[in-house]
Amino acid sequence: MSDQSDSDLSAETLRAIMSRPVAEPLPDPATPFEAEEDGDGPSDMPVDADISAVEECASLDHSDTDNGRRLLRHRGADLARMQETGSDKATWAAWDGKFWDVSDGAFQALAIAQTIGGLIGLEADFLGHTPPENAAIRKAARELDNKDAQAAKDAAIAALEKRQGKRRAFGVSSKNSARLNAMLACAAPHCAVKPEEWNAAQRLLYVENGTLRFIREEDPDRSGEQAAFKGHVEFTPEGWRRDDRVTRLMPVAYDPKAQCPKFRDFVARFLPEALVPGVARAVQIFCGLGLTGIPVQLLFFHYGLGANGKSVFLEVLARVYGALGEGLPAESITGQAQGAAGGASPDLARLPGVRFLRITELPQGEPLREALVKRLTGGEKMDVRTLFKGYFAFQPQFKAHMSGNGYPSIMGSDNGIWRRMAVVPWKVTIPPDEQRDFEEVVTELVAEAPGILNWLIEGMLAFDGEGLKLPPAMVDAAKDYRDEMDPISVFIDRCVRLNPEAEPVRARHAYECYSIWSDENGRKPLSETRFGRVMGQRFERREVSSANMYFGIELHDIPPRSARPRNPDEPGSDRP
C-alpha cells in the first residue's frame, strides 16, 4: 500500500472510531492523556463532533481570525452577540436548547470556545501532502531503486508529519485564555444580532415543555356593528427555535387541565366581588396580558395597609414567571436624582425580554420619577447603557406592578402620568389569629404553578375578547390618589371654568379663592408659586399694570371664608 493510501486510511479510520461506541473506560482524571504529551488534547472535544466540519476546517491556518471561523463553523448556531452601540465588548448569548441564555452568555460562550481546541487537534488527520510531495511519493513508487527518489519520499512524509504535529500543538495552545478570548473576539462581528430582533414575537411565550402562541381572531358567533374578536392559544410541544431569538422562559410546564383552587380562593378572598366589584377580573386580565409582549400604557399600583394579601399575590406571580419576570428596586423610580445624562443604567439594561416587572415596596411620600414611569409604560423604545459597555434600544414588553401601604408623591398635574396609574385597592385585612408565615403561604400557592399559568391564560384570552376595562372601584381609587396628590387640579375642576367673555382674574385673587376652598375642604393650601405654575400651564396668563392676570376663565362656587383665623405658617407669601 502506498504512503498516499496510508494518509487516506487515517481519515477513514478516524471516521470509524468516531462512529463506534466507546467501550474502554476513560483514563483517570489525574493521569494526563498521552495525546497531550504529543500536542493533542481531545479530552474537551464534544461527543457529537461533526467530522465533516473538522475536515473543512483543516484547510484553515493558525491565526486567531481562522480560529474565529472554526468556532462559527462548529458552534456558530449556538452563539450570538447582542449588538450595542459604542462598545467593542461583546454581550454574548448562548443557545441552551430551549432559549438564548443572556445572563450566563459570556460563560457559556467561553465554555463553547473551549471545545474547539480538541477539534483542531483532529484536523491533523485530514492534512494532506502538497502537490510537490505527492509528486515525490509517486516518483518513489515508480523508481524503487532510486535512492534520491526514496529520500524525497521520506522527506515528504516527514514534512506532513511535522505539519500534523504543529496542528495538534496549535490545538492545545488554542485552549489558552488569550487564544480563547481572541477566538471569541474574531467571531463576534459575524454573529451580531440587532436589539430589535430579540424577543420580537410579542404573542409568543416559551414554557418548560414547549411554546404557547396567543392568537386573536374575529368571533363569528358574536354579532354587532363592530367586529367582535376572541382569543385562543396554540401549544407546540418542544417548539423552541433559535430563530425566535427568545431570551427568557417561564419555568412552568403547560398543562391545559391543571387547576389552582387555592390560588383562586386566595384571589376571591382578598379581592372579593362584593367589596371591590370587577377588580379581580381586571387584575387577572392585566396579569394575563403579561404573558405577552403587547405594550400597554398602565402601571398597576397595589395599594392597601399590611396583612391584605397583596405582597403574597405579587410574590407568587414573580415565582411563577421566574426568569420571565424581573424586580426593580424602588430607588430606581423614586427620589429626585435622575442620573447623569448618558450615564449607565444597569437596572434598566436587565429589562429586555421581561414580561412581568415588579417594583419593590415604595416608601410613602417619596417623589416618583414621573418621566421614567412614562418611559417604562410608554410603549416606545428606550435607550439604555450597560455598565462599562455601550448603548442599545429596546421596546418594553413588561407589565409593571408596584405596591405600597401609602402613595408615592406625584407632583405633575398632566394627564400623561395620571392616566397610567391604575390603583388596585386591597381592602381586606387578615385577622391576627389567621395570619400565617409568609413563605409558607407563598410556597403552598406556587405549588399550583401550572394551574396559575392557566389562570393567566384565561386573563389573556379575555383581553383578546373584551379588552381591559378598569372597574369603577379602581377608577375611584385612582381619582382619590390624584385628588390627594394634585389638589390644585381638583380646585380647577370644581371652581374654574372657561369663559372667553369673562373679565380677567387677578392671580392673587385666584390664589386667595384657592386658599379659601382648601380651608373649607380640610386641605392645607400649597404655595402661591406652585399654584401659579399649575394655573399658568392650564390657562393664559399675562402681566397687566404690574399684576399677573388670567384670561378666558371665571371662578365659581367659591365658599365663603370661615371665621377661623388663618394659620400664619400656611404657605402663600410668594407671588407666582
PLM feature spans:
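Conserved alpha/beta core segments of nucleic-acid transaction machinery
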Residues: 462-502
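Glycine- and charge-rich intrinsically disordered segments
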Residues: 1-54, 560-576
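Loop/turn-to-beta-strand initiation segments
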Residues: 353-356, 381-382, 396-400
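P-loop NTPase catalytic core of nucleic-acid-dependent motor ATPases
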Residues: 79, 85-105, 212-353, 422-425, ...
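A short, contiguous, amphipathic alpha-helix enriched in charged residues
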Residues: 57-68, 366-382, 532
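Intein modules and their embedded homing endonuclease domains
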Residues: 24, 28-250, 393, 526
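Walker B catalytic acidic pair
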Residues: 361
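Positively charged interface segments
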Residues: 17, 319-345, 366-370, 383-391, ...
